[in-house]
């Protein structure tokens, strides 16, 4: 356990650290990538260029320091991060690298304010948190390896089918090269693609599993990512998957990870899934798995897209609507093309609104799951809050660094 002295010091310096948190995290990544270039491949460089990773880490540090006297409230965040760490192959030996560079970055930014007493307290606090992560991640690794067909590290898969879902989304159907069994996954989980690219070392990328959990294959559905900011590169791995990977090619995959999941066998109330853009992928897996396990389940699926050209899984959503007597779907285009509305390709034009959720879902009783781009997520979260939906009935997933939805 942490000493009372360490807790007191960390609480005292929290305002100062919070005021400089993003400066500290930017310096941290600069130092670490220079001193330990071997860890650079763990990090999505698009998120580095956009500043999203630095902002997310700054938020995590501030949250830990704020709640250092009651770390139990951080356990949901610990689970999310531990799952992500396992997906990337983070091991106990990586934690000292992070710790030493973080302490050095704090010293660089805070200068003389980072007294030996403060550095010692932050070091103890970091070590305490690192031990929590190492323990949880070890349990996840063990669980993955012990499943029928399970594995740690990477396993070679073959692309058995490649399907264009829209102008910007392509699906890849994957089976093990060794023809061995596939371990079960929880609807909503993701797998990690480990891929070499001419402009970067082997780069792990997480992609949600987008098909029913009962299928004899894994399916990922990849959006062709464009640069997030002017000087950043386009998504290297997503573009390589679209342009360079064909049926018959081999891909190295990590096992399923992730805590944004649903258990179809235990559903006891209506489920509402609200998807924006490529955020449809984990929710489609949830929907198909729920209906497969219980055809009479009450399910409401709202899918938002720009227009019919970029609307992925339109046919699958129509089939889903016919899969059970209590399945209800709605498609909303915010920038419909001429004919999209008239030809029935979408049900409504505009954005997801509080009124739409009120009128088309049992919002007073349902559990809500939503996923999509940050502005979409902020809007949906705000709508649910205005409708009085209890937070314990709301689950959501960001693609990329997880950030606060409530405050800009």
From Swiss-Prot:
EC annotation from Swiss-Prot or TrEMBL: 1.14.12.17
InterPro entries: Cbr1-like_FAD-bd_dom, FAD-bd_FR_type, FNR_nucleotide-bd, Globin, Globin-like_sf, Globin/Proto, Hmp, OxRdtase_FAD/NAD-bd
Cofactor(s) required, per the database record: heme b; FAD
Residues that hold NADP(+) according to the record: 277-282
Residues engaged in binding FAD: 190, 205-208, 398-401
Annotated site, Involved in heme-bound ligand stabilization and O-O bond activation, chain positions: 29
One Gene Ontology term of the molecular function aspect: nitric oxide dioxygenase NAD(P)H activity
This protein's record includes keyword Transport: yes
PROSITE patterns linked to this entry: FAD_FR, GLOBIN
CDD domains assigned to the protein according to its UniProt record, in alphabetical order: FHb-globin_3, flavohem_like_fad_nad_binding
GO CC term, one of those recorded: cytoplasm
Gene Ontology process terms (BP): cellular response to nitrosative stress; nitric oxide catabolic process
Top-rank taxon: Bacteria
Active site: 95, 137
Site entry: Influences the redox potential of the prosthetic heme and FAD groups: 84, 397
Region (Reductase) residue spans: 149-408
Boundaries of every FAD-binding FR-type domain copy: 152-263
Reaction catalyzed: 2 nitric oxide + NADPH + 2 O2 = 2 nitrate + NADP(+) + H(+); 2 nitric oxide + NADH + 2 O2 = 2 nitrate + NAD(+) + H(+)
Cofactor notes: Binds 1 heme b (iron(II)-protoporphyrin IX) group per subunit.
Membrane-spanning parts: none
Family listed: Belongs to the globin family. Two-domain flavohemoproteins subfamily. In the C-terminal section; belongs to the flavoprotein pyridine nucleotide cytochrome reductase family.
NCBIfam families: PRK13289.1 (NF009805)
Annotated protein name in UniProt: Flavohemoprotein
Taxonomic lineage from the root: Bacteria, Pseudomonadati, Planctomycetota, Planctomycetia, Pirellulales
